Amino acid sequence: MATMGQYQFFGMLVLVLGFAGTISRERKNGTGTLIYVRPISYLSYFLSKWKVIGTIALVSVWLGLLTTWYYTELLFGKVDTADFFAFAGTYSVWILFVVTIVVAMSAWLPTGAAATVSLLLVLLVQIVDSLLGAYWTISPWKLAIYATQWLTGSPDATNFWWSIVVTLIAIVGLVVFGVWMSKRNASKTKI
């Protein structure tokens, strides 16, 4: 559980600040010109960024979670394997949601603004959700909570699965938005 708290704050901070300029920085420094003159679709361009960042984030998170699992078993006792993988799988969907927010904001805004909006969406909405979240149980921002519930029992199945569905729909919506913004902002590329 302590590892989750660290991932939720420092991990999200690293993800957002590390990748907020993924697309916007290429527009600003002129590298985007080399890409936009090629016959490549904006969907391919956006998804290539999303896949690479998602892979880096998921591999990093899984290495950290597997290490934590190993040391927890050594020091404190057995953690059920099925519960651990349900926890890690749920948390992976949350990580992909965060990555999608960051890349979509980078396609839309300059680097500083993309980082700010991404941090507000990821961290501030989580704080609001923790304060007022008792009034709604289906939200992408609930996934980290549902992930930890796999280790302490199991989350309410209906709310959990609806949150997964809503998150996947939000990911698709953010990808569509990011592709559209990549196309719209291509003309802002410096030469």
Q: Where are each of the predicted segments found?
A:
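Terminal transmembrane helical anchor/hairpin motif
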Residues: 1-2, 115-191
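Secretory targeting signals
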Residues: 1-22, 46-119, 149-168
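Helix-loop-helix units of permease transmembrane domains in multi-pass membrane transporters
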Residues: 22-54
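Perimembrane helix-loop junctions in membrane proteins
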Residues: 25, 29, 72, 76, ...
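Conformational gate/switch positions in structured elements
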Residues: 40, 111-112, 172
